[in-house]
């Protein structure tokens, strides 16, 4: 990521009026980046670019101190808390640190401390890795965790107590003796590099947003409205500081003694932290940790130096937005220059087509980099997610000399192009409109940056996930054929597309499934019987099983009920697909599809794109040849007491399963919802009904027992 700026005027030549204008521009730009970083967890520029903006701001304010005001980023910390979480006032402000970028700046810091304290020598300093995560304050009363808050703007943060209780590294009760009655303990929430990569892989497979780096993933995971999402994320916590303390747990407290106490109290303290007795020791630590940086399991972006004695810290105090007794020694951005030899397209399990830069091998931060993500078509063209130019609008071409940076020490990315070295014959990159794996045509939906392969049924890159979907509970639901079996059969080449499932029995003389570990003649016979039982399938299950983008269970039922029979559905879809053009679709078949209540343009276009791909039609025809019957959709009745009503089922139902209840309600014309709202007409509550029942009562929604529901529907 690079800052998007025009050539800035030389500070030495600035007049006061011009300085005022430049300060206003810098303050607005920095405030925007602070919001993106602290509130949105989506920084738009690199740390190095951000630091450069701040240093320019500080230099101009130093030259024109009369232009400094209270709202300047040099006088504030972070950004105001985001909406959605309760606000928490910090008893002791969580201020940010001043930065040093060179050894002599660290030496100047140490000399300032020595002079301020009027000491003969530089005092002892604690050096610790600067974790690239999210700052957190934990308030304990009588040893019990009562509140957790983010830093926010340094004075007011967000209450994230419920989410923090799911982090294993944060004790709910402090251990040991000498626990202060009140203590605010602070540290950093972070995510290990390997956990970040695994999370992003799961996000991609689930067709969810992937995170740019471990810091963003940690921040986004902590600030979830749904605590179960936070609990599912592998968050870690390092303790390293404190705020309000009713008293200290030892006499003559020091920084390193307090860190030892935090360790005994049940926190994880970074084992790399070192007590240094000179500036030379501190700088040696900086160099040593810098060399280890690439091999550390977590991200760091520098080293923090803190005066060890707490009485010295108290005497030194604070200046504007940072303490006098601490400073952050930042690492330079890890970048290198190399040649982009080729752009390849990778196809994910959901059909997403991602461009990857193949680079001449280059070492960045101690790691050999040969590939870099190019994200999507717009990124290659020099367009950001917000539609604004990135890299000053410069596109990326094969043959370009590029600057590569390891973002967050994990994902290599291209941050700029060396235009002076662009080959004369370099052509703009044209994103492929066909899948490089299966040859199916690709589509890019309006409002999205990603191109997707439409060969859902036949693309090898998508096969495993599509086949798992095909046999899932709401689709064909074949007993004995789950995700593990699909993975095994696909790996052996036995099942590549849905029709192959129904030919397993005919091919078993060659395959010999009964010889597989965990199988025998009886289990294989049962599997074949379960497959044969599904040769007759309801239309809505078949439509859902096809794995068409945006067609979930609900939309599959809408389509099945509208068309009624398989023949009518296929005839309409083929007619709409035949009329599809780049300019759009004005056919009667498409208009009929688009006008189905609850479908709309996005779903209609996805369905037509599926049927416009001949390879999908071929795979579907092969499947239908193996089926004996596709049952017509049962039309919802309109003459019942619940027709047109919205119903929610909650709790443990004893007279029917949840699926049976849902199916019966839909046959009677009711709409079954998953959550309670003002639009809900009935809530049917079984045993141990929880929050949905409570909400229904609060909203005045009619609550029925199972017997009352059965009486209402006349059963």
Curated annotation (Swiss-Prot):
One GO BP: DNA replication
EC number(s) per entry: 6.5.1.2
Gene Ontology molecular function, alphabetical: DNA ligase (NAD+) activity; metal ion binding
Keywords per UniProt: DNA damage, DNA repair, DNA replication, Ligase, Magnesium, Manganese, Metal-binding, NAD, Zinc
Catalytic residue list: 130 (n6-amp-lysine intermediate)
Record: residues binding Zn(2+): 435, 438, 453, 459
Family membership noted in the UniProt record: Belongs to the NAD-dependent DNA ligase family. LigA subfamily.
Gene name per UniProt: ligA
The name this protein goes by in its record: DNA ligase
Catalyses which reaction(s): NAD(+) + (deoxyribonucleotide)n-3'-hydroxyl + 5'-phospho-(deoxyribonucleotide)m = (deoxyribonucleotide)n+m + AMP + beta-nicotinamide D-nucleotide
Keyword Nucleotide-binding: no
Binding site for NAD(+): 47-51, 96-97, 128, 151, 188, 306, 330
SMART domains reported for this sequence: BRCT, LIGANc
Catalytic EC class: ligase
């Amino acid at each position: 990521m690079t800052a998007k700026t025009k050539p800035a005027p030389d500070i030495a030549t600035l007049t006061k009026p011009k300085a005022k204008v430049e300060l206003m521009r810098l303050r607005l730009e920095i405030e925007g980046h602070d919001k993106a970083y602290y509130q949105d967890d989506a920084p738009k520029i690199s740390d190095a670019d951000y630091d450069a903006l701040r240093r320019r701001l500080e230099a101009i304010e130093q030259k024109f101190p009369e232009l400094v005001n209270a709202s300047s980023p040099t006088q504030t910390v972070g950004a105001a808390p985001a909406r959605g979480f309760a606000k928490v006032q910090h008893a002791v402000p969580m201020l940010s640190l001043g930065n040093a970028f060179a050894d002599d700046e660290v030496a100047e810091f140490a000399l300032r401390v020595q002079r301020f304290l009027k000491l003969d020598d530089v005092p002892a300093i604690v050096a610790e890795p600067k974790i690239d995560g999210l700052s957190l304050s934990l308030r304990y009363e009588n040893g019990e965790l009562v509140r957790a808050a983010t830093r926010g703007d340094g004075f007011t943060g967000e209450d994230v107590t419920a989410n923090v209780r799911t982090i294993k590294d944060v004790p709910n009760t402090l251990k040991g003796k000498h626990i202060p009655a009140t203590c605010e303990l602070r540290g950093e929430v972070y995510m290990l590099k390997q956990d970040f990569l695994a999370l992003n892989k799961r996000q991609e497979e689930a067709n969810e947003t992937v995170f740019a780096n471990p810091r963003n993933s940690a921040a986004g995971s902590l600030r979830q409205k749904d605590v179960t999402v936070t609990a599912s994320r592998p968050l870690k916590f390092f303790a390293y500081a404190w705020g309000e303390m009713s008293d200290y747990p030892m006499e003559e407290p020091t920084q390193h003694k307090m860190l030892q106490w935090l360790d005994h109290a049940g926190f994880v303290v970074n084992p790399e932290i070192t007590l240094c007795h000179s500036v030379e020791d501190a700088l040696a630590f900086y160099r040593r940790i810098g060399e280890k940086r690439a091999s550390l399991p977590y991200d760091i972006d520098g080293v923090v130096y803190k005066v060890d004695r707490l009485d010295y810290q108290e005497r030194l105090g604070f200046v504007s937005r940072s303490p006098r007794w601490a400073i952050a020694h930042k690492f330079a951005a890890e970048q290198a220059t190399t040649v982009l030899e080729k752009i390849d397209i990778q196809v994910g399990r959901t059909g997403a087509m991602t461009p990857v830069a193949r680079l001449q091998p280059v070492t960045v931060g101690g790691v050999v980099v040969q590939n870099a993500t190019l994200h999507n078509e717009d990124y290659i063209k020099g367009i950001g997610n917000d539609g604004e130019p990135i890299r000053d609008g410069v596109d990326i071409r094969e043959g370009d000399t590029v600057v590569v940076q390891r973002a967050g020490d994990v994902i290599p990315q291209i941050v700029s192009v060396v235009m002076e070295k662009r080959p004369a014959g370099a052509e703009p990159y044209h994103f492929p409109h066909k899948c490089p794996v299966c040859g199916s045509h690709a589509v890019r939906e309006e409002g999205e940056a990603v191109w997707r392969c439409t060969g859902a049924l036949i693309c090898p890159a998508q096969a495993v996930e599509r086949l798992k979907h095909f046999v899932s509970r709401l689709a064909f639901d074949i007993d004995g054929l789950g995700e593990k079996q699909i993975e095994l059969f696909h790996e052996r080449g036995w099942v590549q597309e849905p029709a192959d499932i129904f030919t397993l029995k005919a091919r078993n003389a060659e395959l010999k499934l009964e010889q597989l570990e965990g199988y025998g003649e009886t289990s294989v016979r049962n599997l074949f019987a379960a497959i044969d039982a599904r040769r007759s399938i309801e239309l809505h299950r078949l439509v859902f099983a096809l794995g068409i983008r945006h067609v979930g269970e609900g939309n599959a039922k809408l389509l099945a009920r509208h068309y009624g029979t398989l023949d009518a559905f296929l005839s309409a879809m083929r007619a709409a697909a035949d009329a599809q053009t780049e300019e759009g679709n004005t056919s009667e078949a498409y208009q009929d599809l688009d006008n189905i209540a609850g479908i709309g343009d996005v779903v209609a276009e996805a369905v037509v794109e599926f049927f416009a791909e001949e390879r999908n039609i071929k795979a579907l025809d092969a499947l239908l040849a193996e089926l004996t019957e596709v049952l017509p959709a049962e039309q919802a009745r309109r003459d019942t007491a619940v027709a047109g009503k919205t119903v929610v089922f909650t709790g443990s139902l004893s007279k029917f399963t949840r699926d049976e209840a849902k199916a019966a309600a839909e046959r009677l014309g009711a709409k079954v919802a998953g959550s309670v709202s003002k639009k809900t007409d009935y809530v049917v509550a079984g045993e141990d009904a929880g929050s949905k029942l409570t909400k229904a009562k609060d909203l005045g929604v009619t609550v029925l027992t199972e017997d009352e529901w059965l009486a209402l529907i006349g059963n």
